[in-house]
Every structure is written in C-alpha cells, then in structure tokens.
Amino acid sequence: MFVHKTLKMYFPSAFAAPKFAFGLLCRDSTGKNVLLLCFRCSKICLWLILSRLNRVKMYCYSAFAAPKFGILLELHYLCTKYKRMDNRQATLELGTKPVGQLLMQYALPAIVAMTASSLYNMVDSIFIGQGVGAMAISGLAITFPFMNLSGAVGAAIGVGASTYLSVKLGQKDYKTAELLLGNAVVLKIITGILFGAVCLLFLDPILYFFGATENTIGYAREYMQIILVGNVATHLYFGLNALLRAASKPKQAMYATIFTVVVNTILDPIFIWVFDMGIRGAALATILAQMLALCWQLSIFSNPKEMLHFKKGTYRLRADIIKNILAIGISPFSMNACACIVVIFINTALVRYGGDMAVGAYGIANRIAFIFVMIVMGIKQGLQPIAGYNYGAQLHSRLIHVVRLAMLAATVVVVAGWVTGQLLPYYCARLFTSDQTLINHSIQAIRVNMLLFPLIGYQMVVTCFFQSIGKAKISMLLSLSRQMLFLVPLLIILPPIFKIDGVWAALPASDGIAFIVTWVTMETYKKKLRTNAQQ
C-alpha cells in the first residue's frame, strides 16, 4: 500500500465516547459494501467493511474518550495495486459476464457518444444552413469526400489499433497492449500532419475534383482551411476515443464525445453570428471542441494508475505492430476511401443532372441518415471489444450470441430511420433551410436514399464482426460490396438513362445487392463457428 493523503485531525466539539473505538473501512468509488465483519470487546470495537477492489480507499477512525470532546483521526490510503487489479478484472468480464449485459454496458455509452457525434455534425449543418445560406449547405456537402478520406486514414490506425488491442487484452498480453498504445499515437501524429499539409497545398484542385463549382468553391475552401490546420488534433481525438473503448473505458469515450458536442453547440452560434465568421466559424468551433476533449483523453492515458497508460519506450515504431494494425485497419480504410470515391461520383452526377441545389439536398439527406447510421456505429463499437476478446479467448458460443443481439438492435434502429425518412422528410429538410427549392430537392433525396435503409444495419454489424475477429479480407470485401463494387457501376449506368432519378435510385439498389452478399457470407461463417463450438 501507498500513503495517498496525510493524516487528518478533527475535533468534533460534542463528541465523547466512554470507550476507545477503532474502525477500518474499505470502500469503493461507488460506496457499495459487500461484506461486513464486526468484532467487539469491552475495550475496542473494530469494523471491517470490504468492498470491490475498485479505487480502494482505507479510512481509520479513532474516537478517544474525553469528558467534553473527542479527537477523530483519519488515515486515508489509496492502494494503486488493487486499482490495476480491478481494471484487469473489468477486462476479464468480457469473457464471463452475460453477453446481453456486456453489449448494453459497452454499446450504450458508444450509442450516446455516436448519437452526440451525429448531432454534432448536424448542428454544424443547421447553423450553416440557417445562418449562412442554402448555397453554403452545398459547399459543405462538397467537403464530404475530404471527411471520408480523413476518416479513412484515421480508421486505418484508430480502428486497427483498437481492434488489435481488444484481441491482445483477451489473450492477456498486456505488454503488447502498451506498445500498441504508443505506436498508435505516433502514427496518428505522423499521418495527421502529412494529410493536412498535402491537402492544404492542393486544396482548390482537390475541391474542384470533388464536384465544387464557382458558386460553392468559396464556402468549401473557407471551411476546409481551418479543418485541415487542426487535422492532427482530429486524428488523435478519434483515435484515442477508439482506444478508450477497447481498454474497457466506454464511458470515458462517451463523455469525451458529449463534451465536444456541447462545446461545439455553444461556440457555433457565437462564431457564426456574434463574430460574423460565417462558415469559418463553424469549422473553428469544431476544431476547438476536439482539442479540448483531446486534452482530457491525454490526461487519462497519462495516469500511471491506469492499467493501460503511456510509458517510455513504447513510442518507437515497431514493424510487427504497425503491420498488424494496418492489416486490421485496411477494412475500415477501404470503407471510408470507397465512400470518398462514391461521394465524388455522386456529387459529379448531381451537379451535372441537378445543379448545386441537388448537391445540397444530398448533404441534408446524408445528415438525416447519418443520425441512425451513427447509432448503429455505437452498437458496432460496443460489439467490437466483446467480439474481439471472446474470439481471442476461443469462446465461440458467446461470440455468436453477442453478434445476434447486435444485429437485432441495429435492425430496430434502421427501421426507425426508415419510418422517419418516409413519413417526415419535409420537417427533416426544414431543419436545415428555409429555401423552398432546396427543401423540394431534399424531400426526394431523403425518401429515395432511405428506401432500403432497414437492410444496412445487418450489413454494418456483420462487417464489424469480421473486422473484430481479425478477418480483414472478408470485412474489406463486404465493405467494398456496398460502397464500391455495386454502387459505382450503378452510378455510371443509371443517371444517363434516368437523369437525377437515376442518381438517387443507385443508392438503395446498391444496399439491396450488398445485403444479399453479406447474408450469404455470414451464414456460411456461422456454420463454421457452430461446428467449432460443438467441438
């Protein structure tokens, strides 16, 4: 044990006792006690209250008898060894606790965080649309490929490292887990700097390639200049959040996301309207919110009392660790990179057949769908450490069970999204703009884009499942099937025939074909898992 606080002395004026009393109290951070032992004698009374070994605190109370007053002495200790033991115990629960409770425990904070994240992006769009104008919404939509590309680079490291970390924790390889943390942070910094510098250098040509016109290039440029300057903070923020979830700290990851939403929501109207910064103000609010949350994340991983924390010697890049991170991260990288390519195709087709307003409508439709997609992402993030751990521990029956629960939860969410998109498209569009032309385009975009929305929950969970168990090739194939292999050919074939309707129709058609491929792949693998579980 280690002395955590110095001796404290209290002199309660009305306190007196006829006998000497000494008490030893062990209490966890929640204040719950699970065992009480009481020893009595004529001279001394000893209370020993034991609780779970989570942030164990030990208090020693002594009440010395006196006619008029008593002296209360308090000794306060913190046993850091037990704190680390409890962190490891929390990780071991991934293989023993009922999977339904685990999924709720891990997914709920992630769902709250992802919902907050979707609102975070939605708030930006609402303030830009209402405060700057309809054309600014179109300019913001032009930047979506940038976000996808940045997300692709970040996911290659962040998701790859967090998934690999879950597997290593399942194997109880804590030394490799520490090396993973250090290597992931260094890679995040390097890629963040390189990505931001290259994109800033060729910003205008890239934006025109992404579908910008003379009407939208100014808005897109102003927004991306600030976003790219703060790109390192963005990469670190999202990467450390993924590592927090993998390290059995989903609540801390949730708090970080909620914090960014609150700060961004407060700063957006101040920068856009009070300081009259326009779309630049929205970008600045986003970066500042992420930087503040990043400071808190770094404080968690800098705490030596944590089971997983920054250590000297873990920042030197190791080829074997980088290889494993990228092998797993190639799937989410491909998914985001393909999303970037697809959005470029969509923007180009929309500008050609529908004009800038059609691009803005796609941006609004994306934001509405994004809310429900991010909730499913929360379910996926809750599933990832559970699936990774149980796969690493060879607990196949638990693995199948938790995947089924995740599929059910994801399907409920996307069905709710489908109902919203089909019944309330006008009110959804009206949140972002008062321009009637943009609203009319958006109603069509929302309804058609979400036509087969109930199918994507299953597809997303299955992709996450294969990613979590290290099946990078299968996960990448399924990701490509929905976002690249089917959608791009449809975007090439349908628009010349059906014009703007062909662009919208390509999206649900791709969802339907990808669902069939995903279902066949998953059923085949489930049979293999059942066979292993029976053996």
Predicted ranges, named:
Residues 105-124, 226, 260, 289-293, ...:
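Transmembrane helical elements of multi-pass membrane transporters/channels
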Residues 3, 10-15, 19-29, 59-64, ...:
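Intrinsic disorder
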Residues 94-132, 145-160, 164, 189-196, ...:
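N-terminal transmembrane alpha-helices
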Residues 137-197, 234-253, 361-425, 456-475:
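Small-residue-rich hydrophobic transmembrane alpha-helices
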Residues 119-138, 207-214, 270-277, 337-367, ...:
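Helix-terminus/linker motif at the lipid-water interface of multi-pass membrane proteins
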Residues 149-152, 264-269, 294-298, 370-374, ...:
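Hydrophobic transmembrane alpha-helices of multi-pass small-molecule transporters
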Residues 158, 227-245, 256-264, 282-295, ...:
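Short runs within selected transmembrane alpha-helices of multi-pass transporters and secretion channels
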Residues 70, 74-107, 165-232, 274-329, ...:
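Short alpha-helical transmembrane segments in multi-pass integral membrane proteins
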